[in-house]
UniProtKB/Swiss-Prot annotation:
The gene is DGKA. A zinc finger (Phorbol-ester/DAG-type) spans 204-252, 268-318. Changing residue 554 to N: No significant effect on diacylglycerol kinase activity. Diacylglycerol kinase that converts diacylglycerol/DAG into phosphatidic acid/phosphatidate/PA and regulates the respective levels of these two bioactive lipids. Thereby, acts as a central switch between the signaling pathways activated by these second messengers with different cellular targets and opposite effects in numerous biological processes. Also plays an important role in the biosynthesis of complex lipids. Can also phosphorylate 1-alkyl-2-acylglycerol in vitro as efficiently as diacylglycerol provided it contains an arachidonoyl group. This is Diacylglycerol kinase alpha. The lineage of its organism: Eukaryota, Metazoa, Chordata, Craniata, Vertebrata. PANTHER family: DIACYLGLYCEROL KINASE (PTHR11255), DIACYLGLYCEROL KINASE ALPHA (PTHR11255:SF38). SMART domains: C1 (SM00109), DAGKa (SM00045), DAGKc (SM00046), EFh (SM00054).
Length: 734
């Protein structure tokens, strides 16, 4: 077997990661087979030979065979980097080294990956990287940059300067501490060395099957795909082909970031033939005859559509069109190693420390947004709203830079927040339900961001009470996303209150369900309302197919309310519950309640208003509420409560009493206006003496006797949509 030595190439590493994406096996699963299972025969002490290594890869990657060039390159890489002279002579590799490497790739901590790579290049095992070892690192970085299609002609001196900067004490060598410090703050070492591989713009189309309701022509063979027939369309550039033409298609034109200094700051048009859905030229305003052949051009960034003949009249520079306020053009994103030395020095003091290690592709790229714009960070939950989430995901990937759009099912919101961390004046759009919004807000809370961005909501699925209150509607129904983005551009910021919930259980043998959240964004309830929600939740978990529309949900809710009214599980609630508002007891003795709701926003259960409508007093409502709040932390006077309007930024909660399940069902189905207004306050405490149903933001649970304290936590900037346009002339007068 050849003893050619060398590190695994970037392309081989990319192929390895692709295999790992589709495998469900863990390293621990494979090790068991080698230690005491069917693969034990391949063990030679604590090492395995090439044949055993191939078996390891086949089992771990769940494939029938691994390309010989890949398995050989990996095997030789382990021999070069990790093994002693003895193991090299025996033509084996240490199984512990192999398992350690793949464990790190599975999801190891960044600091572990950094330490691992340090030892990989420290070939003489003296604990420092000398000049020859640093040169070896630079060579590997150059290979990686070439694989990523960066302009390598300008890169070598930059990398040499960067490696000098890592030598913080000027000793002429790099210690492990200096290596870890650099990787944790300013230098994307893992990406540059090929251990993080999501940077490649590889020219591959992101195909999705599409059935075309009107004549469309194949970008490759230029013949008709057929009316009502299915073809393939690229999510990123709208390049469209027959299924059988996809293998021969030209590479995707979309490059998501600048790969050379000369490309930074100047965005040019990227024209793709066809895709002119409007049928009208944005240059001459005449029709584009799209029904007869493959004609016209569209720009993937500004989305202008023009005749082929109008191209010479168009300038080279692209301003990103109507959505420029939201878009990060490729010219605004570039490898951080291409930043000047001064910029890197500044970022050393502004970015994270080794105590906050969480490296990813985001550290490899730097964002320098176009001035006077508000780049949009989009989070999409593809599971929300059936298939709506998936459609919204690929639509935004076309309308914006794909690097602005994050699939929450992949890695959650953290990668997106890290990527935008240093961007000024950006906004966030959350595409999902109230639960998804809560997840994003909680992550922002924990992220310790230098700038807390305002958050807008594109509601998917049912419910969506927060989106309703912020004027984004009760659910996305296929509206034009470009128009929604223009509405977002015109939105206003409101600082929404958020509340902490502390549940202190009493000593009891009963076991409580886990509390779903520690923060209230929408509402908290105890009693009949939560009991109905709990039944609804259990049934939906068992039979999700029965809860796939708003109308079905309303009917099911009404049915559960009816059955709850028969059993009255929360009757005489005041006998097992006491309430304190700002330290003062709330008198419930004259009321026959089966539930209490604490509201941060006026909408619950998909649009129900438990507080009810308020006759508008003369003057500014927000000002009146503030005046009332200034007079007293607690408002319980019924006459004053009649004039109080819910305000999600007044640091006050509305407390509502509910008589029973029938009343709750009537409110939910709009047959009754509201419950009983009990109080408006800034702090509330419940003491319970028996197990009761409770819910936070629509997530119910059964709670054993306890004390519950609700206090103000903070405020989060949220974006409120523009007011709805009036549908008649007289509406302008209101």
């Amino acid at each position: 077997m050849s003893k050619e030595r060398g590190l695994i190439s970037p392309s081989d590493f990319a192929q390895l990661q692709k295999y790992m994406e589709y495998s469900t096996k863990k390293v621990s699963d494979v090790l068991k087979l080698f230690e005491d299972g069917e693969m034990a025969e391949y063990l030679q002490g604590d090492a395995i030979g090439y044949e055993g290594f191939q078996q390891f890869l086949k089992i771990y990657l769940e494939v029938d065979s691994v390309p010989s060039h890949l398995s050989l390159a990996l095997f030789q890489s382990f021999q070069t980097s990790y093994c002693s002279e003895e193991t090299v002579k025996r033509d084996v590799v240490c199984l512990s080294d192999v398992s350690c490497y793949f464990s790190l790739l599975e999801g190891g901590r960044p600091e572990d990956k950094l330490e691992f790579t340090f030892k990989l290049y420290d070939t003489d095992r003296n604990g420092i990287l000398d000049s020859s070892e640093v040169d070896r690192i630079i060579i590997q970085m150059m290979r990686m940059a070439e694989y990523l299609d960066w302009d390598v002609s300008e890169l070598r001196p930059i990398l040499q300067e960067m490696m000098k900067e890592i030598d913080y004490d000027g000793s002429g060598s790099v210690s492990l501490a200096e290596w870890l410090r650099a990787g944790a703050t300013t230098v994307p070492l893992l990406v540059l060395l090929g251990l993080e591989m999501t940077l490649k713009d590889n020219g591959q189309h992101m195909w999705r099957p599409k059935r075309f309701p009107r004549p469309v022509y194949c970008n490759l063979c230029e013949s008709s795909i057929g009316l009502g027939k299915q073809g393939l369309s690229c999510n990123l550039c709208k390049y469209t082909v027959h299924d059988q033409c996809a293998m021969k298609a030209l590479p995707c034109e979309v490059s998501t970031y600048a790969k050379s200094r000369k490309d930074i700051g100047v965005q040019t048009h990227v024209w793709v033939r066809g895709g002119c859905e409007s049928g009208r030229c944005d240059r001459c305003q005449k029709k584009i005859r799209i029904y007869h052949s493959l004609v016209g051009l569209h720009c993937v960034w500004c989305h202008l559509e023009i005749h082929d003949d109008c191209l010479p009249a168009m300038g080279h520079e692209c301003d990103c069109g109507l959505l420029r306020d939201h878009i990060l053009p490729p010219s605004s994103i570039y490898p951080s190693v291409l930043a000047s030395g001064q910029e890197r020095k500044v970022s050393k003091t502004s970015q994270k420390t080794t105590d906050d290690l969480n490296l990813s592709t985001s550290e490899a790229l730097r964002i320098d947004p176009v001035s006077n714009t508000h780049p949009l960070l989009v989070f999409v939950n593809p599971k929300s709203g059936g298939k709506q989430g998936e459609r919204v995901l690929w639509k935004f990937q076309y309308l914006l830079n794909p690097r602005q759009v994050f699939n929450l099912l992949k890695d959650g919101p953290e990668p997106g927040l890290r990527f935008f961390r240093e961007v000024p004046d950006y906004r966030i759009l959350v595409c999902g339900g109230d639960g998804t919004v809560g997840w994003i807000l909680e992550t922002i809370d924990k992220a310790n961001l230098p700038f807390v961005p305002p958050v807008a909501v594109l509601p998917l699925g049912t419910g969506n009470d927060l989106a309703r209150c912020l004027r984004w509607g009760g659910g996305y129904e296929g509206q034009n996303l470009g128009k929604i983005l223009k509405d977002l551009e015109a939105s206003k910021v409101v600082h929404m209150d958020r509340w902490s919930v502390e549940v202190i259980p009493q000593q009891t043998e009963e076991k409580s369900d886990p509390v779903p959240f520690q923060i209230i964004n929408n509402y908290f309830s105890i009693g009949v309302d939560a009991s109905i929600a709990h039944r609804f939740h259990i049934m939906r978990e068992k039979y999700p197919e029965k809860f796939n529309s708003r109308m079905k949900n309303k009917l099911w809710y009404f049915e559960f309310a009816t059955s709850e009214s028969i059993f009255s599980t929360c009757k005489k609630l005041e006998e097992s519950l006491t309430v304190e508002i700002c330290g003062k007891p709330l008198d419930l003795s004259n009321l026959s309640l089966e539930g209490i709701a604490v509201l941060n926003i006026p909408s619950t259960h998909g649009g129900s208003n438990l507080w009810g409508d308020t006759k508008r007093p003369h003057g500014d409502i927000h000002g009146i509420n503030q005046a009332l709040g200034a007079m007293a932390k607690v408002i319980t006077d019924p006459d004053i409560l009649k004039t109080c309007v819910p305000d999600l930024s007044d640091k006050r909660l509305e407390v509502v009493g509910l008589e029973g399940a029938i009343e709750m069902g009537q409110i939910y189905t709009k047959l009754k206006n509201a419950g009983h207004r009990l109080a408006k306050c800034s702090e509330i405490t419940f003491h319970t003496t028996k197990t009761l149903p409770m819910q936070i933001d629509g997530e119910p649970w059964m709670q054993t006797p306890c004390t519950i304290k609700i206090t103000h936590r903070n405020q989060m900037p949220m974006l409120v949509g523009p007011p709805p346009r009036s549908s008649n002339f007289f509406g302008f007068l209101c």
